[in-house]
Amino acid sequence: MMISKKYTLWALNPLLLTMMAPAVAQQTDDETFVVSANRSNRTVAEMAQTTWVIENAELEQQIQGGKELKDALAQLIPGLDVSSRSRTNYGMNVRGRPLVVLVDGVRLNSSRTDSRQLDSIDPFNMHHIEVIFGATSLYGGGSTGGLINIVTKKGQPETMMEFEAGTKSGFSSSKDHDERIAGAVSGGNEHISGRLSVAYQKFGGWFDGNGDATLLDNTQTGLQYSDRLDIMGTGTLNIDESRQLQLITQYYKSQGDDDYGLNLGKGFSAIRGTSTPFVSNGLNSDRIPGTDGHLISLQYSDSAFLGQELVGQVYYRDESLRFYPFPTVNANKQVTAFSSSQQDTDQYGMKLTLNSKPMDGWQITWGLDADHERFTSNQMFFDLAQASASGGLNNKKIYTTGRYPSYDITNLAAFLQSGYDINNLFTLNGGVRYQYTENKIDDFIGYAQQRQIGAGKATSADAFWRLSRLRHFLFNAGLLMHITEPQQAWLNFSQGLELPDPGKYYGRGIYGAAVNGHLPLTKSVNVSDSKLEGVKVDSYELGWRFTGNNLRTQIAAYYSISDKSVVANKDLTISVVDDKRRIYGVEGAVDYLIPDTDWSTGVNFNVLKTESKVNGTWQKYDVKTASPSKATAYIGWAPDPWSLRVQSTTSFDVSDAQGYKVDGYTTVDLLGSYQLPVGTLSFSIENLFDRDYTTVWGQRAPLYYSPGYGPASLYDYKGRGRTFGLNYSVLF
């Protein structure tokens, strides 16, 4: 985190973020703005909850220095787990539990647990990022660990142009290089303004600390040999002094190269363990992994609506996720099918928030949320003989089936939040959210039975469908102590809700032997036998923060507990099981600007433990889910026009009661920049000491997929070795 020589607080509602961003951007570089990730119009100093803000300068230093977004956030946010170094942010928990990601108040998490929210926007379009930790009942399901709200750049009244170009390489191969280029133009007047941007990035091959090519992730899909395009437009219309309209539109595409793939050896020998998988060219597949998405949001705000502040937002977003071809393997380690899934989500919704102050010292925030989501998916099967002969590179479609049940989800919610200043020292906060969820599952034939029909081994099968309704009340309460103007302490309780993936939950059925070509359904997951339940999390927090001229620190002890868990089955479906689980830890950050020098230093950390209750005794939790502790540190030196920063990230060991272990590792980076007469030249050396290591996801993946889907070596995903980056950026 950066520290400036001025202390400024900005009050901001997340639904007002897009409206206020231009005003924030006009502040001088030596001012620190702090925003609230709460739906009430409060500053961080008025919040009884841990909140972090990643400012534009901090984010640009990391991104222009060559860091991928997930790596940059893990470096800057104390409670966020280290990056998977893949396309996905799967397993990147906040305080050991799932997170929600929003862009300008629009939720990117869908009911499906595909974790590509951080593969949904290019960092070039980000102005700043705010993070709120702990369960957040004001944002509905999924936010049991916390949320990340990405605030995008907006147009200014004056004409401005941005340009950025960069490259990155480890010089291990002619294919070992990434390139990026981005540009934007913005302008207008005091009544109307806008911004249009285009950002493109091309990833080449990646190599580990030993100079060997890292494996493509065929489970969550990787970024090697892929392209990313982000086109975004925003517009702001100031109707009068109190009313404003703002429009945000985006097209995003991140897709793998259509020439490079994971070679599994002739006859899929790597799956049997008789050869080593490797990345090679020659891919010829009818389905390429990637992410496509569209976003449009229209927001209306009125700061003088019947004596209240009103913000209304309507939005639409869609995404199409395609996965890498993956084998189906029998007990004899023979590949019986080779296929790839595509999962599509369409979502629209609205948010209405009103803030009022009925009397001095009393604030009320209330509102309504509504959204609807449609999910469909399919599985494309490839000619097995051709795929086998080519090691999984020549993939020609032969038929397509459904992958998970299609479904519609409707959410309706009402919330009320209030804050009352008891006196000059204490503020009491509290609120409630009521949420109604309806899941309607379409008729669905079991996935394995669809394969039999597609392969001609059966002609028909029974289908099943489901309709379920969920109702939840979620509460929060907090007490804030204003010790001094720059210093606060707080005690907080909040509830969050994790909603299981309906497709994976209901997509199971037991069928009998075919009768005249028809497969009869004998048993399935149904509402009466196994009602879909949410996992409610109770979260407690005791914290303290201090923001001074040279020192900024925030520390919190936290504890969360739940009595159910979502667990993955061997067939990649899920179940909700009784499982009393608790997570507790201490998280914090200290940043210090050494007076009368150009030096600064800082550290952030998250030390936690995850346990489940087994036969009345608390035991270490499964390492497939339990988050490791983490610490980062930096030393900065910024004599004008230079800026240099050495930083480290450490993920610590974590083990479970079954004896499994995820090994920790430390990486060190050097980031720097030089201010030219026109523009800025940034440079970096990532993984400075060329550390050879397996990522956290690379150690977890074998526990999910091996030996059932091949040897552990097939899922040994390494981190990238030493890489050098160079970037030029200019704003004029």
Curated annotation (Swiss-Prot):
GO BP term (any one): aerobactin transport
Motif (TonB C-terminal box) on chain: 715-732
Recorded GO MF terms: siderophore uptake transmembrane transporter activity; signaling receptor activity
Domain (TBDR plug): residue spans on this chain: 43-153
InterPro entries in alphabetical order: Plug_dom, Plug_dom_sf, TonB-dep_rcpt-like, TonB-dep_rcpt_b-brl, TonB_box_CS, TonB_rcpt_b-brl_sf, TonB_rcpt_CS, TonB_sidphr_rcpt
One cellular-component annotation, GO: cell outer membrane
Pfam families in the cross-refs: Plug, TonB_dep_Rec_b-barrel
Record keywords: Cell outer membrane, Ion transport, Iron, Iron transport, Membrane, Plasmid, Receptor, Signal, TonB box, Transmembrane, Transmembrane beta strand, Transport
SUPFAM superfamilies, sorted: Porins
Main location: membrane
Location in the cell: Cell outer membrane
Sequence motif: TonB box, positions: 31-38
Membrane topology annotation: Multi-pass membrane protein
Top-level taxon: Bacteria
Endpoints of the signal sequence: 1-25
Family statement drawn from the similarity comment of this UniProt entry: Belongs to the TonB-dependent receptor family.
Function: Receptor for cloacin DF13/aerobactin.
Protein name in the entry: Ferric aerobactin receptor
